[in-house]
Design a protein with these regions (language model features):
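Surface segments flanking catalytic/ligand-binding clefts of nucleic-acid enzymes
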Residues: 80-204
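Short gly/ser-rich loop at a beta-strand->alpha-helix junction or flexible surface loop bordering the NTP-binding
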Residues: 1-104, 138
């Protein structure tokens, strides 16, 4: 993707918007959409012969309108993680579409995004928890010693029931190193609370 947002599924083609009624030539690997964009949705990119591209905010909303829910949330989380957009910018853009088709879906996506999200897998798991009506845990929860030293940082945590939840993908981490590190972390966290601390793991 142009702006470097993390994706759940890599696109099979480059998607290009063209003005409604404009003629175009079909090209392999390019998917054309007929849609007229307003000036606030585009910006010029490049040197002496710039091309017009969708802004980061418009890109996030375009993905939100066309991708499955979990993919849309992952894109929005990634855009915020990279600092390309803010939640306020997305909220303002959605409010500007009040009364238009698809705005309820956009609001649903905004309700699921998380400024603290650290990865695509965390986005996917958060959506899955919401779809199964499981109370959302606290993201990137930090456990410290009495002296303030960080012992563990959980992807999700429910402190009131002493539960941490990690989501890891084998494509991102070496399994052996990950298991050893996770065991040490869980043991240290359990020691701090004087008993057992549940830390189930999920993967894709």
């Amino acid at each position: 993707m142009l702006w470097g947002f993390d994706l759940v599924v890599e696109p099979a083609a480059i998607e290009v918007h063209t003005a409604v009624g404009r003629t175009h030539v079909a090209m392999a690997g390019v998917l054309l959409h007929a849609r007229s964009l307003v000036d606030t949705e585009v910006r010029d990119l490049g040197g002496h012969r710039p091309i017009r591209v969708m802004t980061p905010v418009a890109t996030v909303l375009d993905c939100a309108a066309s991708r499955p829910l979990h993919e849309a949330v992952a894109v929005a989380d990634s855009a915020m993680r990279l600092g390309a957009v803010t939640l306020d910018q997305l909220t303002e853009a959605v409010q500007a579409r009040r009364g238009l088709p698809g705005v309820r879906r956009l609001r649903r996506i905004l309700a699921l995004v998380d400024l603290a999200c650290g990865s695509v897998l965390e986005s996917l798991l958060r959506v899955l928890l919401a779809q199964h009506e499981i109370a959302q845990g606290r993201s990137q929860y930090v456990i410290r010693t009495a002296g303030g030293q960080i012992v563990a940082r959980a992807d999700f945590a429910w402190p009131d029931v002493w539960l941490m939840l990690e989501c890891d993908g084998q494509r991102w981490r070496d399994p052996e190193d990950a298991r050893g590190r996770d065991r040490r972390r869980d043991n240290e966290a359990a020691g701090l609370v004087g008993g057992s601390c549940g830390s189930p793991g999920t993967t894709w």
